[in-house]
Amino acid sequence: MATKILALLALLALFVSATNAFIIPQCSLAPSAIIPQFLPPVTSMGFEHLAVQAYRLQQALAASVLQQPINQLQQQSLAHLTIQTIATQQQQQFLPALSQLDVVNPVAYLQQQLLASNPLALANVAAYQQQQQLQQFLPALSQLAMVNPAAYLQQQQLLSSSPLAVGNAPTYLQQQLLQQIVPALTQLAVANPAAYLQQLLPFNQLTVSNSAAYLQQRQQLLNPLEVPNPLVAAFLQQQQLLPYSQFSLMNPALSWQQPIVGGAIF
């Protein structure tokens, strides 16, 4: 009886061990993909090659590290494209006006292009405009510095001390340039009073009120038939053209601004 009980217990033990046991093949040719079905992941990595483990770790690190910066770069590129599109649309709105300005006045067009890059223009528009107006008088001041350095230095000193220069620099510079004509007009008054009076005609109120009468008066003064001697008429016209030669040597810009005298010769 005892032997039967022991035999039953042995059979039960074998049955229980057979249901809970699993086989690990020592020399199996099965691929590594089948192993995780029977073993946990940590145990399955122990049976892989070291090169395979390093490759999997590298792929995992690359996926975790590079995924977030790629998304950020894509977002930055989209934002940059959006800003570039808005800037292009704004620039296209001003292209017709800038094209017309380029045709009419190329210098003003270039200044308009440099307006955004000038810190003075962004900080103080009034000071920038005053600076642009002062640059219009720089050629005349440069010529004055070459012809007469003492007068140029004196003018620079007066520019810093005069209240008119501080309040309205272009008007002050224009006034100073007009004062340069006074010595030539004085010499003309001594040499030829008639030509001197004719030189003052552009400042006459008759030119402002009635241009036709002013032109008729100029033609009467310049008509050589009214002078009895043609040589005297030619001499007077030559005397009238003399101040313009002096103006062209001293200041070419002012010589272009002066009225043309001696139209009968030309």
UniProtKB/Swiss-Prot annotation:
**What keywords sit in the KW lines?**
Seed storage protein, Signal, Storage protein
On whether Kinase is a keyword of this UniProt record, the answer is no
Looking up InterPro entries in the UniProt record yields: Seed_Storage_Prolamin (IPR051529), Zein (IPR002530)
Q: Name one GO molecular function term.
A: nutrient reservoir activity
Signal peptide region: 1-21
Q: List the disulfide bonds.
A: none
Miscellaneous: The alpha zeins of 19 kDa and 22 kDa account for 70% of the total zein fraction. They are encoded by a large multigene family. Structurally, 22K and 19K zeins are composed of nine adjacent, topologically antiparallel helices clustered within a distorted cylinder.
Record-stated family: Belongs to the zein family.
Q: What does this protein do?
A: Zeins are major seed storage proteins.
UniProt-listed PANTHER family: ALPHA KAFIRIN
Q: What is this protein called?
A: 22 kDa alpha-zein 8
- What organism does this protein naturally occur in? Zea mays (Maize)
